[in-house]
């Protein structure tokens, strides 16, 4: 597949932005937006250790200009075996998109869903085919001028996923986007935009992967989730990148009245991950469930910042993030619950738990509250623990090998996450990858 992939553009510049936009035949409004993002990129500094949000994550070795941007293109092809394994059985999906090195090789959507108004395609294609549905929403949830990474993404994103669900349509099966990346020195910048109209329901699963010893690469992604009144979105982001990859991203949802978003973030791969996951509950009665799981080994570094923003009365958020760390892996969790003055009757819960398997591993956890309302319930907490040797001894006394005993304890630790995932394909993939991560643990 690599031979047929579009060439990666190099040397970040305003001319590159104009060239990529022109080659894609984009409308003037999008070209102008990209150029404005480029100006912000030039103006904004790269985050440093002086920034509190970046103090525990060292990116001093990162050179954004060293990665060539992968443009989006479409070319029919067969999925590489690792991507097929990552996606699993497509029969259980209502729709499927497969992307290799920026090239969309497959797009599948049942005719009955298309006839009922569901749109599931790349965002680049949607700009041309459905501008009336893209333009009002693109960039309204994630702004290009928030920091240098957002600006980098806003100027140069390509491909990504556009999912539009018309009013009242409920889709029972998940839609799946599978992405494989193995291009040396590539920058992959997908943008996902999900718009669910009133009283609709949909599930989007995005899986990403590259070979364990794969090429050096950069991923900078953004996800905008927009559920209208009474709509429900379930979003899963599962990555198994190779260790030579940097990943930066943001997943942000803005919820209207009585809307619901369930998000699940899973990180198994990459050398360094820095991701923001945020829910802004702006409509009365809206609900956000935020789940996260990270399993680090070697020298992997995972940094998650979460925000539960309650801006309306009678809203509910529930966050549970868990990390398992071995070898010299490190995790950073910074979570904020914010309840504005008008957010009375708020219910907000935030919990981060970490399990350390090796002496050299480390977890930093910083849960926070900002409360302006006075009639609400907010709880937050964090814990970091190590394996209980007494419990391991007890299991081994029942003729279980130590490796099996430890795996049972890890499974028990993660069961709180697994039990809240209704998607069998996701639970199965998580279980398989956790088992692989534990193979060399003694």
Language-model features: locations:
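N-terminal amphipathic, basic helical "cap/leader" segment at the start of enzyme domains
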Residues: 2-151, 176, 320, 325
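Generic hydrophobic-segment detector
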Residues: 27, 40-43, 91-92, 349-350, ...
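Conserved beta-strand/loop scaffold segments within soluble protein domains that form the structured core
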Residues: 111-112, 116-400, 414, 418-442
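Short, conserved phosphate-binding/catalytic loop or strand-edge motifs used
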Residues: 411
């Amino acid at each position: 597949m690599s031979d047929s992939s579009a060439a990666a553009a190099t040397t970040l510049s305003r001319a590159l932005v104009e060239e990529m936009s022109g080659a894609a035949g984009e409308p003037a409004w999008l070209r102008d937006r990209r150029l404005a993002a480029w100006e912000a990129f030039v103006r904004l500094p790269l985050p440093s250790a002086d920034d509190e949000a970046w103090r525990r994550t060292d990116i001093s070795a990162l050179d954004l200009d060293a990665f060539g941007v992968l443009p989006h293109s479409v070319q029919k092809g067969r999925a590489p075996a690792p991507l097929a394994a990552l996606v699993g059985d497509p029969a259980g999906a209502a729709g499927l998109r497969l992307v290799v090195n920026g090239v969309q090789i497959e797009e599948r959507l049942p005719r009955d869903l298309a006839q009922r108004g569901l749109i599931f395609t790349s965002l680049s294609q949607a700009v041309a085919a459905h501008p009336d549905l893209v333009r009002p929403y693109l960039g309204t949830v994630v702004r290009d001028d928030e920091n240098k990474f957002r600006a980098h993404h806003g100027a140069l994103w390509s491909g990504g996923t556009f999912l539009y669900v018309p009013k009242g349509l409920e889709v029972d099966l998940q839609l799946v986007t599978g992405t494989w990346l193995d291009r040396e020195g590539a920058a992959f910048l997908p943008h996902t935009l999900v718009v669910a109209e009133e009283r609709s329901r949909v599930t989007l699963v995005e899986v990403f992967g590259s070979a364990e010893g794969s090429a050096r690469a950069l991923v900078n992604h953004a996800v905008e989730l927009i559920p209208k009144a009474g709509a429900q979105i379930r979003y899963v982001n599962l990555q198994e990148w190779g260790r030579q990859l940097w990943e930066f991203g943001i997943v942000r949802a803005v919820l209207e009245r009585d809307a619901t978003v369930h998000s699940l973030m899973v990180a198994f791969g990459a050398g360094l991950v820095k991701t923001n996951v945020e829910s802004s509950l702006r409509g009365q009665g809206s609900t956000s469930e935020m789940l996260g799981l990270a399993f680090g080994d070697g020298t992997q570094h995972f940094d998650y910042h979460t925000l539960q923003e309650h801006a309306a009365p009678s809203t509910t958020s529930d966050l549970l993030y868990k990390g398992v760390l071995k070898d010299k892996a490190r995790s950073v969790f910074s979570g904020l619950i914010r309840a504005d003055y008008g957010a009375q009757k708020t219910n907000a819960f935030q919990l981060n738990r970490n399990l350390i398997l090796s002496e050299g591993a480390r977890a930093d956890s910083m849960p926070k509250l900002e409360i302006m309302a006075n009639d609400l319930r907010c709880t937050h907490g964090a814990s970091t623990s190590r394996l209980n040797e007494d419990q391991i001894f007890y299991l081994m006394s029942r003729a279980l090998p130590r490796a099996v005993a430890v795996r049972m304890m890890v499974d028990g630790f993660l069961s709180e996450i697994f039990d809240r995932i209704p998607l069998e394909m996701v639970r199965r993939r998580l279980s398989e990858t956790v088992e692989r991560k534990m193979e060399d643990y003694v």
